[in-house]
Structure formats: structure tokens, C-alpha cells
């Protein structure tokens, strides 16, 4: 049986070659995660400067030294960066540690959750509708290959998430609060026909906001990647992807065999 503690040491070193590809531009540093099973090498994206600068700062300050991959979900991802994991014991609940600030979302449609993607963890949509990122917790996508039917379901889920966020934002507005209060009052008074009319007004206003942006659909590049090497496509457009594994992807695969 493997020991529960999987140590992570992140070191930054100079890398002389700047690599350019169509989808994204790599920064000129390589970040190395030293694990029990070997090295994982990362490159960060120039398209996400806030996340890149923050990650580099934490590495140089040795924040990640001896932290754990505290969350491992087979065919999904491995997650680390919780400062509470440094001195944790077997069975401790982890994943709630933070460092007092969040990062503005840098979601970019070109940067996707393919296998090996480095992404920022965050709080859920209900309390974080702007998709702000955790400053320290990150995950690396493990994922699996998907079918075209899977991708259609994920498109629907992403669009539903956007619709729900539009609804929450409308209810926070002055007009939305007034309509919601009116709806609640009519419901309590059992005036259901009138309540239905008010609810229709709320839904129509939400749809107007929702339709201000185009519905989300995977492009051909995403389809090709997700149906071959795989990933977690349902997280696209909702979490910030700010880098990727360039060497050592096989180390991530090893973690799927570990039981916590």
C-alpha cells in the first residue's frame, strides 16, 4: 500500500527556448514538480499573465514545498496546493486551505482542459459566479477520451451553467429583487396564476441576458483532442487553464492507482 503523503516540490529554472504553437504561447520557464514517482514538468501560458505571475511567485517563495496532491479522482484530475496539507494526518479533510486572496478569471476559449492541462481550482458557481480562481490550489487534468455524444451533453451543461449564472445575477438586480419578492408573496398567498406570470417575467429577463452572448460549442480542435487524448471538456469556459504538462504525463497516470 502506498503511503498517504505524496510530497510535491516545485522548483523554477531558466529555460532558454520560447516555444510557440497556434493554440497558446509558452512562457520561458519550466516548472518541475518532484513527486514520489518522478518529475512532472510544466510550462505556463503567456495568455494568462495573472495566474502565471502568481504561480511563479509562490514557487520562488517555496510555498508548495512538501504539500500533497490531496485530491485524486481517476479519469478526472489530481489536485494540490492546499497549505494545510503540509502537516496533515491520514484521514484529515483537505481542500479548504487558502492564502487570503483570489485571482481574477482568465478563461480563454483557446486554452482547454485537455489531458495534462494545468488549471486553477476555485469555489463553486453559487458563491463564485465570476469564476475567480484560488490563489494556490491547482489541478492537473487526467481525463479520458470522450464520444461525440458526451461532448454534446457537456455543451448543454456549460450553457446551463451560464444560464443559471445569468439568473443569479438578474435576481441580484433591483428589478430582479422586486420581482422575486413579489413572486414569493403571491406564492405564500396561494395566488399561483399571478405567481406564474411573475415567474415568466423573471425567466424572460434571464433569457435576454443569456442571449447577449453566443451559446457555447466545442470547436473542431477541441473535438479532435477530446475524442483522442481526452480531458475534462465539461470544465471548459468555467475554470482558468494556465499551463500544461510538457514531460511526465505518465506520472499523473500512476496516481490513478493510489487509494487514499
Where would I find each of the regions flagged by the language model?
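Cyclophilin-like peptidyl-prolyl cis-trans isomerases
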Residues: 21-260
